[in-house]
Amino acid sequence: NNIDYSYIFESAIKSRDNRFISYQERKTITQNKRLINGLPFLISQGTHSLIKWKEYDLYKTANDMVIYSMLLNEVRPEIIVEFGSGSGGSAVWMADICKSLGFNNHIFSYDIKKPNFKYNDITFVEFDINTLDIEKKLPLFVNAKNKRILVIEDAHVNVSSVLHTVNKFLKSGDYLIVEDS
């Protein structure tokens, strides 16, 4: 496999131009395309060697952690919604990073099986993402109209429906991340 690193680097720089666009525009642009050939494979290596944060498994690469830290500092979300709690390590890590950056927020982390511990500023919610009912299961969106929101889709289930549903509640300045740890 011959990887063109200069192409990957240039593609990454160009990708910043369309950073703040609607989900529909992003879907149209990326339909059946790999925008940055080779890069996802290169930077995802090591994700499953399990970095730990405190005693919790953290399914993130060092690169992910740097990007998230920068994003959290820039966006400063008042509410973080995470679909796919896993072990809960990601939510704990984000809560600690936000505190270290000097701002308060609350994290709502949803999974079909919620982690079995409590942590300041995090609410773990047992939730089957196949039964999207925003009004019943995600009341925080109704009450978050004047707050900056960061949504992270990392559940890998019913992704299209989740994105379409969540998109109705997002506004300019909010952020949506789709990841696959």
Feature-to-residue mapping (PLM):
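A short alpha-helical cap/connector motif
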Residues: 1-151, 155-181
